[in-house]
Amino acid sequence: MTSLAELRKNYSLGSLDVADIDRNPFRQFDTWFQQAVDAKLPEPNTMTLATVDSRGRPSARIVLIKGVDERGFVFFTNYESRKGRELAANPYASLLFYWIELERQVRVEGRIVKTSAEESDAYFASRPLGSRIGAWASNQSQLIESRSQLETREREISLQYGDQPPRPPHWGGYRLVPEAIEFWQGRPSRLHDRLLYTRSDEHSDWQISRLSP
C-alpha cells in the first residue's frame, strides 16, 4: 500500500488578495463557480453538507447546489432523511465546495430555513420523471430488506401516478442563510490564501478578513 504520509501536492495555480475580490461574497462565489464550469470540472455543483444532531454528533454527505442568490444557498432533499432530521433538531449547517483542479475551496456556514412550497414545487416539476418517482419510492435513510423492495416500490409509484407524480409532502428545499463564507486558494509551501466574509446579521454589510493558513 502507498504510504499516506508520502502523498502530497504543491499548489501553485493562483493567488487571492482582498484588492482583487468582490466585496459581495455571492458575486465572488458566482465568479469562481463560473470559472469551475468554464474549466469543465466534473459536477462543479457538488458540495459537502455537514450537519449536527441533537447530541452534537456530526455527519456529512455530498449533495447538489440548486440555487444561489443574495438570500443564500439552496438544495433539495427528503425532509425525513438523516440530514432532514438533524436540521430539524439543529438548524445550522456548513457547506464545502472543493474544486481540486483549480486548487480552490469555498466554505459556507449559517442557519437553515426551508424554502417556500412554491419554490419546492417549481424545482420538483423540473426534475426528470425517474427522479420524481424516486422521491416517492425511497424512504431515505431508512433500513430496507433488499434492492428488490425498492424497485417494487418504484414500479408501484409509477403505476399510481404515471408521468405526473406530485411533490411528496416530505420532500423539498432548504436554504442556508450564510453568516460566514470563506474562499481558499492553494498556494506553495502550504501558505494558502484564506479570505473570510462575515456579517452580524442578514442586513449588515459583509466584512472581509484574512486568515492564517
From Swiss-Prot:
Domain of life: Bacteria
Pathway this chain belongs to: Cofactor metabolism; pyridoxal 5'-phosphate salvage; pyridoxal 5'-phosphate from pyridoxamine 5'-phosphate: step 1/1; Cofactor metabolism; pyridoxal 5'-phosphate salvage; pyridoxal 5'-phosphate from pyridoxine 5'-phosphate: step 1/1
GO BP field: pyridoxine biosynthetic process
Binding site for FMN: 61-66, 76-77, 82-83, 105, 140-141, 184, 194
Positions bound to substrate: R8, K9, N10, Y11, K66, Y123, R127, S131, R190, L191, H192
Cofactor binding comment, as recorded: Binds 1 FMN per subunit.
Catalytic activity from the UniProt record: pyridoxamine 5'-phosphate + O2 + H2O = pyridoxal 5'-phosphate + H2O2 + NH4(+); pyridoxine 5'-phosphate + O2 = pyridoxal 5'-phosphate + H2O2
Job description of the protein: Catalyzes the oxidation of either pyridoxine 5'-phosphate (PNP) or pyridoxamine 5'-phosphate (PMP) into pyridoxal 5'-phosphate (PLP).
Protein name stated in the entry: Pyridoxine/pyridoxamine 5'-phosphate oxidase
Naturally occurring in which organism (per UniProt): Paraburkholderia phytofirmans (strain DSM 17436 / LMG 22146 / PsJN) (Burkholderia phytofirmans)
Highest classification ranks of the organism: Bacteria, Pseudomonadati, Pseudomonadota, Betaproteobacteria, Burkholderiales
